[in-house]
Amino acid sequence: MALVIYTKPGCPYCQQARDHYNSKGIPFIDYDAQNDSARRKEMFAYSGGDPTVPCIVEDGKYLGSGWGNPPRG
């Protein structure tokens, strides 16, 4: 499984997503969509232009943007 989380620095919801996956022992790749324009472009391609982070993608499939209770992704 390849889980990717597109985030931005200082985002508390992004940190909640990281903490969730870390607590479950699920490995993920964390991309900075704010400061890396190429990653931001990728994120927009998955999310249909939605700028909401975290944006979660698993095995190339868009799972959702944002973080709530219950967690998305």
Where are these regions (language model features)?
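Non-catalytic, surface beta->alpha helical segment in thiol-disulfide oxidoreductase systems
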Residues: 58-73
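Local sequence-structure signature of Cys/Sec-based thiol-disulfide redox active-site neighborhoods
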Residues: 1-29
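Glycine-/small-residue-rich active-site loops that bind phosphorylated ligands and cofactors
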Residues: 12, 35, 63
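Thioredoxin-like thiol-disulfide oxidoreductase module
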Residues: 32-50
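Structural micro-motif
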Residues: 47-57, 67
